Amino acid sequence: ATFFDPQPRLLAD
């Protein structure tokens, strides 16, 4: 995910 991804769960991707 990107830094501004609306879904925080994707930040761990």
Curated annotation (Swiss-Prot):
One of its GO terms (cellular component) is extracellular region. It is found in: Secreted. The keyword Protein biosynthesis does not apply. Keywords: Glycoprotein, Immunoglobulin domain, Secreted. Plasma. The keyword Secreted applies. Glycosylated. It comes from the Eukaryota. Interacts with CRISP3. This is Alpha-1B-glycoprotein. The gene is A1BG.
